[in-house]
């Protein structure tokens, strides 16, 4: 199994620009992203950094939680990444990055445009959100290594609190980020 990647410069640059919005959850969110990106690389068999579109999508994929104070964060996250890509004249990445964000909580396998990046990203996020209970064939030892290198720092606890609050507010739509 490959060695975990220790730095994702594009992702870190983006996170730095949103540090105030993310506040005390910054380290937990950064580590979540690092775990997801490492799981993505392992699922794809990549050695080294994933492409720029992946690193950008990873940085923005849950960002709407903090910027818009909502668990229905996919549309705000796409809006933020679209503004980011426009400001850098990287419009050619919009479709792929938007698909990566919008479909990362799809319940079933993803088979549409950009499936070669979207599906492993979806799986990598699920590996992390499930705390490694869902593995998609990754060795348990690799998952544990990545988890120990990039500890939780309260990320999963924050998700549980937000989910409980969402359930109380809207019991018929408790997890608005999930896609069928």
Predicted regions and their residues:
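Hydrophobic alpha-helical segments of small multi-pass membrane proteins
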Residues: 81, 102-103, 125-126
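Membrane-interface starts of transmembrane alpha-helices
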Residues: 90-95
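Divalent metal-dependent phosphate-bond-processing catalytic cores, especially two-metal-ion Mg2+/Mn2+ enzymes
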Residues: 2-9, 19-47, 60, 89, ...
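An active-site-proximal "capping" alpha-helix that borders the catalytic cofactor pocket
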Residues: 36-40, 72-87
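Short gly/ser-rich anion-binding loops that grip negatively charged ligand groups
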Residues: 26, 67, 71, 87
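Glycine-rich, flexible beta-strand/loop modules in the N-terminal catalytic cores of phosphate-handling
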Residues: 15-16
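His-Asp-centered metal-binding catalytic motifs of divalent-metal-dependent phosphohydrolases/nucleases
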Residues: 50-68, 77, 98-105
């Amino acid at each position: 199994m490959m060695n975990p990647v220790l730095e994702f410069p594009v992702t870190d640059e983006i996170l730095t620009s949103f540090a105030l919005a993310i506040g005390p959850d910054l380290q937990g969110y950064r580590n979540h992203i690092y775990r997801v990106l490492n799981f993505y690389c392992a699922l794809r068999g990549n050695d080294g950094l994933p492409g720029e579109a992946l690193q950008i999508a990873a940085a923005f994929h849950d960002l709407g939680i903090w910027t818009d104070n909502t668990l229905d964060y996919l549309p705000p996250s796409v809006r933020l990444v679209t503004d980011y890509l426009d400001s850098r004249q990287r419009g050619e990445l919009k479709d792929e990055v938007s698909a990566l964000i919008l479909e990362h909580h799809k319940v079933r396998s993803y088979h549409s445009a950009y499936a070669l990046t979207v599906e492993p990203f979806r799986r990598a996020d699920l590996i992390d959100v499930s705390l490694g209970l869902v593995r998609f064939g990754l060795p348990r030892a690799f998952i544990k290594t990545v988890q120990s290198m990039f500890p939780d720092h309260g990320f999963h606890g924050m998700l549980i609190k937000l989910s409980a609050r969402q359930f109380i507010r809207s019991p018929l739509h408790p997890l608005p980020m999930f896609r069928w």
